[in-house]
């Protein structure tokens, strides 16, 4: 009975995000306890209480891109679009055309790339974010970027990740 409910809830999430969660179904089939632990990751990511929506989605997009998971990036595109994020901004984030972004969004993208993609630091970007959005938003953006990079790792480890074709993702974002 619990598995049936779990699969129904996963199906609802798939509809909301616009991608399939094959690996989450596999977790549900394997262990309800493991599914509960996995779901805690989403509760860690989903509440965006302090960061501006666009900055939050820039952080999540760049985090997912760093993990090279096509369906994960597609999910982040869909979530960003659902909040009304401008498709031109999404495209600039996908193509790394940061010079066209507002300064604080460019700083968010640079920090996400440094932290999740290069495993380095970008103190200037961090200070720009802190001065523009505040300390709480900075922390939340760090949760967003690293969380969006973490989930594809679970998916890849289970054998469900697909490589990310940025050109295809740009077409999806514009559709």
What role is predicted for each listed range?
Residues 104-143:
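Acidic/histidine-rich alpha-helical segments that form the ligand environment
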Residues 51-52, 84-88, 122, 134-135:
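Helix N-cap / loop-to-helix initiation motif
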Residues 20-26, 53-67, 139-142:
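Alpha-helical scaffold segments that form or flank carboxylate-/histidine-based iron centers
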Residues 94-103:
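Acidic/His metal-coordination segments adjacent to aromatic residues that form catalytic metal sites
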Residues 56-87:
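Conserved alpha-helical segments that form or flank metal/cofactor-binding pockets of metalloenzymes
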Residues 38, 42, 58-63, 93-94, ...:
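Short alpha-helical scaffolding segments that buttress acidic/His motifs in well-ordered protein cores
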Residues 1-53, 81, 173-175:
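Mobile cap/lid helix-loop segments that border enzyme active or cofactor-binding sites
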Residues 146, 154-175:
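Acidic, carboxylate-rich catalytic segments that either coordinate divalent cations
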């Amino acid at each position: 009975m619990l598995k049936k409910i779990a699969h129904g809830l996963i199906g609802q999430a798939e509809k909301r995000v616009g991608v399939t969660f094959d690996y989450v179904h596999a977790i549900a089939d394997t262990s309800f306890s493991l599914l509960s632990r996995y779901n805690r990751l989403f509760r860690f990511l989903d509440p965006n209480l302090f960061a501006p929506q666009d900055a939050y989605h820039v952080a999540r997009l760049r985090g997912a891109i760093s993990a090279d998971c096509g369906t994960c990036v597609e999910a982040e595109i869909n979530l960003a679009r659902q909040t009304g994020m401008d498709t031109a901004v999404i495209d600039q984030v996908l193509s790394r055309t940061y010079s066209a972004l507002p300064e604080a969004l460019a700083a968010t993208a640079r920090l996400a790339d440094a932290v999740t993609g290069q495993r380095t630091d970008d103190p200037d970007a961090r200070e720009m974010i802190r001065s523009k959005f505040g300390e709480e938003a900075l922390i939340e953006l760090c949760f967003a970027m690293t969380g969006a990079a973490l989930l594809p790792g679970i998916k890849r480890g289970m054998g469900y990740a697909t490589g990310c074709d940025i050109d295809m993702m740009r077409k999806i974002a514009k559709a």
